[in-house]
Design a protein with these regions (language model features):
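Positively charged, low-complexity terminal tracts
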Residues: 1-96
Length: 96
């Protein structure tokens, strides 16, 4: 029997933080995901949150995110992505 998990959400965390940029790095034992923002006309991204997790949890997150995107697209249509952008373009998302 699966146990119910009670999730506590701090009010400040519940407000959320907007991110239009992220960067992923890893070592043999962990994945690091930085979430940040790039503002028009500014050359730098500001990191607002860093999540560090195990490779196993990173893969479970990937699977959960993929399923959630599939559900979203089945209800709202395909999410369109811009064409290929160079890593230093400064807008959108980046994988390392």
């Amino acid at each position: 029997m699966e146990k119910k998990l009670n999730v506590k959400l701090d009010e400040k965390v519940g407000e959320g933080t907007y991110a239009n940029w992220f960067m992923l790095t890893f070592s043999p034992s962990e994945f690091v995901i930085d979430f940040g923002r790039i503002l028009p006309g500014l050359p730098d991204a500001h990191v607002y949150s860093r999540v560090i997790t195990t490779p196993q949890h990173a893969k479970m997150f990937l699977q959960n995110l993929q399923k959630t995107i599939e559900n979203f697209e089945s209800q709202n249509g395909e999410i369109k992505l811009p064409g290929a952008m160079p890593d230093n373009h400064g807008v959108g998302f980046k994988n390392s």
